[in-house]
């Protein structure tokens, strides 16, 4: 097949070579636009790829998990299940709290999802309990996303109730108003309230019941409209002393009369200022505190949000008393900034290394300056396009630019080398620039579009992984396009003005020595190539062996999803026996905190005990361990986690589960460990049968560690078995029984105190200090139909049973989540396969379904599409090359280089002990685009030699290989050195960048060595095949 002859008049570069001023000003414009774009771009850890997620929390103090599920969660789930665009709905119903997490499709705007959620809540309102203290509250936040900032508020002079009141009113509300903030939570449970603790014996002796007291309190404290008077000349608003504001006022409240004497609330109860929920507590290090966690909205920029908070914080803290101390314990943006700074440093290092290699090859300062200008100009110009595409400066886009350093210099090198060759032959610089640029223009276009073709499949990757790498692929493609433009405009213009025979011939001792070295290398390569061309079948067997080895390595290499990052923050879950009380759990938490804070890598610790929207049961505690900066500690986060777990194992009666926080959050639940696997059934009974069996087998697998389940069905329950006949005969209804129990043991919110700034609750309960445990039930009294007082024990028996501490649903069906980590000597792929094999051995019934969740599910999806992604990249490149060369054969020759890149990348990953994760796969796809450049440069010149000089195919490819050896070696080394800083990365976020560098460096080294010999052999093989095919067709035509 024929290709278009290269122009000797400069081609598309002619206009720019002949008009240097216009070309210079055009490049200055690109430079200024890029600088302005860089300053305007936001900074983040990763591209914003969050699923639209909304959390709905409903609190119903005193309700059991079963009541929460049936009375609150189920009605809401039925309404939410009808929403369009809903991807997944999970819920957790625990004692007094229902948390529903709604994850929507990526294409659905968060504001639209918010409107649908509000409409669903409104539709479910009439189905919820009438005495629900507050309606369901939704937040635009992913509960599994770690807080962007954690603050601890402490005071040595003020009670925690006053501290929380001030913080909630003066600080939390203001922070909630900041753009990008999704939720501000105050952990510690010290919200002010008036607590009424009834003396059961006292009210029994007076013939009263708790319901009598509750009715008296609710009737005595009201805040409703009273109207106004409108006279002939004046209007008067009516008001009254219907509100009671303090504990003293409640203490004086008359609740009944006996023999004409008043019975005041203080006579039968202890009334005091206290906390609304006494079973909640938070600590910062070892000090009781109010812990403020700030979470961002899905899609919000974490850096700008945190900057806004820090800017406002001094003003907010000034409004607090001096005895109140606000401490920032963690700020995720600190590590994000450090990671981005390290990546920017590696980008600058890559540019410096690339320029150094250029000088090593060209041995000429003017010739080195030209690509030294082209490289930063191409990269800086990319920022201008990124602004228009709403991208950000993040680890992936900076990685793309770092890799692009090796790409964009290739075009400039090829142009300079070709123009320099003509100048050295005696051509005038201007004529050489026109001739050299015209000759190489088609090659530049081929290189550019075939490389961009490799990136096209990345743009069509589905789900969150596709969104994640879209910015990477487009940023890299834009840099390559700008590089091609610069190489066809600025580079030849500068060559025509800066290069000359004198400058190129001017040599020093270094240049003469390096010239001799390169001449010897080229001569040695020529001798080796001649031998290889004489033994083509041996070379072909090597090429086929690399293809087979690539397949074998692909099958056996450990596979992962996303590198585990060291962001300096560890999330933890502390688990105690299921019957543990709040006091018992708080004591255990303090023991564990003492152990953790002794570790030299730990900077601070926050912990929380109690049941709320984030913690499902009293026997668990949430921990956040903040590590010292990476340069102030000796070990990475995984070693710190292992050390902490070993230390905490010595604390009796608790299990500690730890996992490092990650920039990429795909999960919607706060789990104990990194990976999740769910078991779903149509009933809780089915789960209770199969969960223990599966857990027993999974805990024996060496591929898994820290295996745990959120299935807790051994919570103690005091079951009140009422004799309904006896109760009915006395005129006592089940509602009366429930009310009596709720009044006594539910921390019941019975009334509201309204102030100008806030609202506070009146909490009713029995004082159980003298009657702990089940004995407190003997003090319950009910009112019969004739007004008499009836002990609960006369109509009911108390049975001790077991029940789940929380009930979880996934898409409205009961589910349990099994969490696990992966040991160091295994990969996530090994763990997933082991779980699937174990599941098959159990023969689960058809009503039991299993599914991986979060990052494990994303891993399966990414792994399934990886092969097709690579195939798509190869096909896309074949189509582009076929169109450019007008040939079916030459693209195959070019693509024959790919297995060598795969072998090199996979071997490098194995040697380095890295998994084949999505970052490494991106590196392999980029290698597909890089290594074919060698073949393109060889084939272009071989075809031109055959066409213009009448050489035989063997002579043409031999001369092309020797002629293009130096630029091939130079461009490969430039790409290799561009990836080298990533491979050697050790700073913050290095775990994310290193697999890309390792794969690319390994692939480039192996492919460079092999393709210099295999490509010419395959070129000649296909040439002979084409001639044989033509002769066969010609013979058939003659016979016909």
UniProtKB/Swiss-Prot annotation:
GO terms for molecular function: xenobiotic transmembrane transporter activity. It is found in: Cell inner membrane. Induction: The mdtABC operon is transcriptionally activated by BaeR. Keywords: Cell inner membrane, Cell membrane, Membrane, Transmembrane, Transmembrane helix, Transport. InterPro entries: AcrB_DN_DC_subdom, Acrflvin-R, Multidrug-R_MdtB. One of its GO terms (cellular component) is plasma membrane. Signal peptide: none annotated. Part of a tripartite efflux system composed of MdtA, MdtB and MdtC. MdtB forms a heteromultimer with MdtC. This is Multidrug resistance protein MdtB.
